[in-house]
Amino acid sequence: MESPFSPVLPHGPGEDWESTLFAELGYFTDTDDVQFDAAHETYENNFDHLNFDLDLMPWESDIWSPSSHFCSDIKAEPQPLSPASSSCSVSSPRSTDSCSSTQHVPEELDLLSSSQSPLSLYGDSCHSPSSAEPLKEEKPVTGPGNKTEHGLTPKKKIQMSSKPSVQPKPLLLPAAPKTPANASVPAKTIIIQTLPALMPLAKQQSIISIQPAPTKGQTVLLSQPAVVQLQTPGVLPSAQPVLAVTGGATQLPNHVVNVVPAPVVNSPVNGKLCVTKPVLQSSTRSTGSDIAVLRRQQRMIKNRESACQSRKKKKEYMLGLEARLKAALSENEQLKKENGSLKRQLDQVVSENQRLKVPSPKRRAVCVMIVLAFIMLNYGPMSMLEQDSRRVKPSVSPANQRRHLLEFSAKEVKDTSDGDNQKNSYRYDHSVSNDKALMVLSEEPLLYIPPPPCQPLINTTESLRLNHELRGWVHRHEVERTKSRRMTNSQQKTRILQGALEQGSNSQLMAVQYTETTSISRNSGSELQVYYASPGSYQGFFDAIRRRGDTFYVVSFRRDHLLLPATTHNKTTRPKMSIVLPAININDNVINGQDYEVMMQIDCQVMDTRILHIKSSSVPPYLRDHQRNQTSTFFGSPPTATETTHVVSTLPESVQ
């Protein structure tokens, strides 16, 4: 239920509201003994018997007239307080006169005084005129300053007369229609405090309805007893309007209204108005609730600000995402275009490559013809003619212009040896050309034959010296063998031969003319037999040993050789080998043959080794018999004195 009350009570200049208000309230007596339960009291709103004709006082009567104050467009604003203000409508002194004795005020007013001027609160309501009820009013509590002014207020019985004492006219507010009190509506207590400048109201969500009063008079109707609590802050903190005026809404900011039941007791016997004691209530609870409400409002404001900021950030984030999406889409389109262009270029390159890979038939035919012409030039008749012409030229080779120390055969043998030398020289001259011209290229076959391995430079003088010594060694063995054979055949012939040797003692070598012999004496002594026979007789043996014309051969069928291995080996050079064989001294006067053995040492490098299988039929007959004897001697008994112990067969280069 809403309680109408006025925020401001104007006063006339020069009047002491405090003195007049509490002076009149001091006459109320017998208020301490009267208690009434407002919950069990019924009120009747019968305004037909009420007299609202007021004898208004001359001070500012036009301001408080209903025509000037209560209008549809009124706007209530908190203003600085006068020495006295009121939050409820109070009837004028004349209105109490016009009303019957049944009028009563079912409210309890708590007046809290301070060092400043207090606020006045009056409220009355009209009841049924059938019975006269005494008016019950509250006894104001004066502050410390008022106690010194008034002192003890005497209790006076208020006579229900038609002419009460004159009091200052308070502000009249139209009363709202009274509704029966419900148990669910809490009681309210209105606490009035004196303020220095403004009268702020406590923060509550209660609405005060103000309606225009009738023309004849003004009646204030409070739905429930209430005590208005006014706080001391000079500024009215407000967040929501609480004052509603009919016709035009004028609201006062937040206030706190605590309603407590205020019983009113009607005393028909003595006709006195019983006024209850004022209820004193501290403002600490309202202050705490105000702080809580203020904090709640601050939290609401912060929440709204944070929500606004979050919405703003979200909007900015969405705008950024949209911009990035647009940039990504544009970049994607650009990349698609570039990808398409690259694919087209790749297709063009692939097609061009395929066209270039397929050769035309004309080019293929030309290539085949060039290859055939090259083959014909290398293996054709022109190359053969050049080779034939070259075969005739080797006769001029310097290999044929060498000195022959001994010649034992006739002219035919010389021609045969010359032909063999020509063939061998041609073969090596063809493989390794002696031409040193810079711009002349030797003709080689199409199939490349790798040249022989690199050989160190050979001194020509040293080569000739070695060749001369080897040939002399072979021929000396031949001379010794021939001499021993003739001595066995005929002593006479031996003497002649020895005489001839003595005559030619000045020469170291001597040429011996001999004829072919079909058989050789098997009783020959220890000697080196040089084999001179016709090429056709022992051609099979030469083929078996793969004889080469530029190589000296030492053939032995004995098994009792002294072989000494090498103690060191150099991997970067060819293996070296020395052959030590019996030799004949050039001059018997140089070394005595009785105390020393004359041997020939041949140092050479091993070029190759291989195993040969020679047929026994190809071996010369005289070597075959020696082979049998030496084999049996090597595996059996030692040889006899009559058997040959050292037989070496030497095959010279010049004879085949």
UniProtKB/Swiss-Prot annotation:
Modification note: During unfolded protein response, a fragment of approximately 50 kDa containing the cytoplasmic transcription factor domain is released by proteolysis. The cleavage seems to be performed sequentially by site-1 (MBTPS1, S1P) and site-2 (MBTPS2, S2P) proteases.
Region (Interaction with THBS4): 455-575
Record site feature (Cleavage), residues: 406-407
Span list, region Transcription activation: 1-137
InterPro entries, A to Z: ATF_bZIP_TF, bZIP, bZIP_sf
Glycosylation sites: 459, 570, 629
The bZIP domain, residue ranges: 293-356
Subcellular location, record wording: Endoplasmic reticulum membrane; Golgi apparatus membrane
Annotated transmembrane regions: 378-398
GO biological process terms held by the UniProt record: endoplasmic reticulum unfolded protein response; eye development; positive regulation of apoptotic process; positive regulation of ATF6-mediated unfolded protein response; positive regulation of autophagy; positive regulation of transcription by RNA polymerase II; regulation of transcription by RNA polymerase II; response to endoplasmic reticulum stress
Covalent cross-link Glycyl lysine isopeptide (Lys-Gly) (interchain with G-Cter in SUMO2), where: 75
Annotated segments matching region Leucine-zipper: 335-342
GO cellular component, one term: Golgi membrane
SUPFAM superfamilies reported for this sequence: Leucine zipper domain
Residue location of crosslink Glycyl lysine isopeptide (Lys-Gly) (interchain with G-Cter in ubiquitin): 139
Listed Low complexity bias regions: 81-101, 111-121
An annotated Gene Ontology molecular function: enzyme binding
Membrane-related topology note: Single-pass type II membrane protein
Region annotation Disordered: where it falls in the sequence: 81-171, 632-656
UniProt free text on domains: The basic domain functions as a nuclear localization signal.
PANTHER family: ATF6, ISOFORM C, CYCLIC AMP-DEPENDENT TRANSCRIPTION FACTOR ATF-6 ALPHA
Family: Belongs to the bZIP family. ATF subfamily.
Protein name per Swiss-Prot or TrEMBL: Cyclic AMP-dependent transcription factor ATF-6 alpha
Source organism of this protein record: Rattus norvegicus
Name of the gene: Atf6
